[in-house]
């Protein structure tokens, strides 16, 4: 006679099991009575995850498990490879799941928890975000470095359902200090690593991956851009930004651009809305100076031209000066707020009031009084004067000679232009738009 132990002391000694409710429902609705699945065990932590299919990027000790609709199990159902058996049924329109493990000659019932389905996973965000609507939104993210990787994961946590990821780089050691990826991701394509991170937060998301350079494969990007609801530009060079800006204008799509300056002393965010000033207008307005842009790596610097071919190792070290992860957080956060605001537009949500606050085309942030911001006023008792740790909004005029959006274009890359805001007289010459 089969002996099943269900004592509380035995339950506490055995593993805790997690099972995706969507996978359990899928099995229950199939015609199969049994299904060989996969168990992934965190050894030494008494935690396992059961899946009906193999994970693309597995973790822990992988074994097989058995899903069955039969309420009764026998010792013969277990084997050297099958360590766990899950019985799945439905009672009163609710899933009834029990998981068992063979312990010597005894079958022990294990405490099992169901991972919520798609409708429940982000229920705590309801009221603040329209999760059901966001699940149908399609966002393209170009550049999966410190900015893009974090933004992708946060949008997944918010419930965005469709992603198109663009980046041809791999995760390298110099990325780890600020990147969302970890040491275990070294050498992997960033598109693969961030796909895994997205699905780890939102297993119901659809992720499309493009390990390409959009500056040389514009057609591929444009084919995607015309289908999305929003584009996040988190690249580190103007070549790709102009490709994105042109596609946004051509297909009338919204875009959010963000960058940090040297050592992340500060940064800026620009939002393109169809009919408004584009990224070309922003460059032509002389607000940005690309010479001050942060160079995140030698490879990126050589691609963009920030590091010349003849540069010595000492020169390279002087040019490649990245900032702290904590210093890019405010810039990423505003990009995310603008993205969620645009994706939720027209819906009554908990962030709708931000539409009255975030009306500017561009925003500038300073983390500390270094480099371009050295003559800004100390935060302490700054009053109305320009200071650090505050967002400043700017209205950008449309450029009638813009190379991207005007009828009479004149190309201006803006590489040697700077706004008085970044000059030594920044606190005097720069005036915020009070309208």
Describe each model-derived feature in a short phrase.
Residues 172-173, 216-217, 265-267:
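Generic structural signal for helix capping and beta-alpha/helix-loop junctions
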Residues 1-110, 223-230, 234-435:
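Glycine-rich phosphate/adenylate-binding loop
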Residues 142, 166-168, 210, 233-234, ...:
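Generic beta-strand/beta-sheet core signal
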Residues 193-230, 235-238:
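A structured beta-alpha segment of the ubiquitous adenosine-cofactor-binding alpha/beta core
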Residues 168-204:
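Glycine-rich phosphate-binding loop and adjoining beta1-alpha1-beta2 segment
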Residues 127-172:
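Glycine-rich adenosine-cofactor-binding loop
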Residues 94-134, 154-155:
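Non-catalytic propeptide/linker segments at domain boundaries
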Residues 152-154, 177-178, 243-247:
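Short amphipathic alpha-helical segments
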């Amino acid at each position: 006679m089969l002996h099943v132990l269900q004592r509380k002391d035995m339950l506490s000694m055995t593993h805790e099991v997690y099972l995706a409710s969507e996978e359990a429902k899928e099995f229950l609705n199939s015609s199969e009575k049994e299904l060989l699945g996969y168990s992934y065990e965190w050894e030494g932590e008494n935690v396992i995850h059961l899946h009906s299919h193999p994970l693309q990027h597995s973790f822990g000790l992988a074994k097989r498990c058995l899903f069955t609709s039969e309420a009764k199990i026998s010792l013969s159902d277990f084997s050297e490879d099958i360590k766990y058996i899950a019985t799945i049924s439905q009672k009163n329109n609710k899933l009834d799941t029990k998981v068992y493990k063979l312990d010597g000659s005894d079958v022990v019932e294990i405490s099992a928890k169901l991972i919520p389905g798609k409708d429940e996973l982000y229920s705590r965000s309801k009221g603040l975000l329209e999760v059901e609507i966001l699940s149908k939104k399609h966002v393209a993210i170009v550049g999966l470095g410190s900015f893009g990787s974090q933004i992708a994961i946060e949008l997944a946590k918010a419930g965005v359902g469709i992603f198109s990821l663009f980046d041809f780089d791999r995760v390298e050691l110099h990325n780890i200090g600020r990147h969302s990826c970890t040491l275990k991701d070294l050498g992997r394509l960033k598109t693969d690593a961030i796909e895994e991170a997205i699905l780890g937060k939102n297993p119901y998301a659809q992720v499309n991956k493009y390990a390409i350079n959009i500056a040389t494969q514009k057609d591929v990007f444009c084919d995607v851009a015309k289908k999305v609801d929003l584009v996040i530009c988190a690249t580190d060079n103007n070549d790709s930004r102009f490709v994105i800006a042109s596609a946004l204008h051509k297909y009338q799509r919204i875009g959010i651009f963000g960058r940090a300056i040297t050592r992340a002393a500060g940064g800026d965010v620009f939002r393109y809305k169809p009919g408004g000033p584009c990224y070309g207008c922003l460059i032509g307005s002389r607000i940005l100076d690309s010479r001050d842009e942060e160079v995140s790596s030698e490879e990126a610097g050589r691609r963009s031209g920030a590091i010349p071919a003849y540069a010595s190792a000492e020169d390279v070290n002087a040019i490649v000066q990245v900032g702290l992860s904590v210093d890019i957080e405010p810039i990423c956060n505003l990009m995310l707020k603008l993205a969620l605001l645009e994706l939720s537009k027209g819906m009554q949500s908990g962030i709708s009031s931000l539409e009255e606050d975030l009306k500017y085309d561009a925003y500038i942030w300073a983390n500390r009084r270094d480099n371009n911001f050295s003559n800004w006023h100390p935060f302490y008792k700054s009053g109305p004067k320009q200071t650090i740790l505050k967002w400043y909004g700017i209205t950008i005029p449309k450029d009638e000679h813009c190379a991207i959006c005007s009828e009479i274009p004149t190309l201006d890359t803006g590489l040697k232009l700077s706004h008085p805001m970044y000059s030594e007289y920044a606190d005097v010459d720069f005036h915020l738009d009070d309208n």
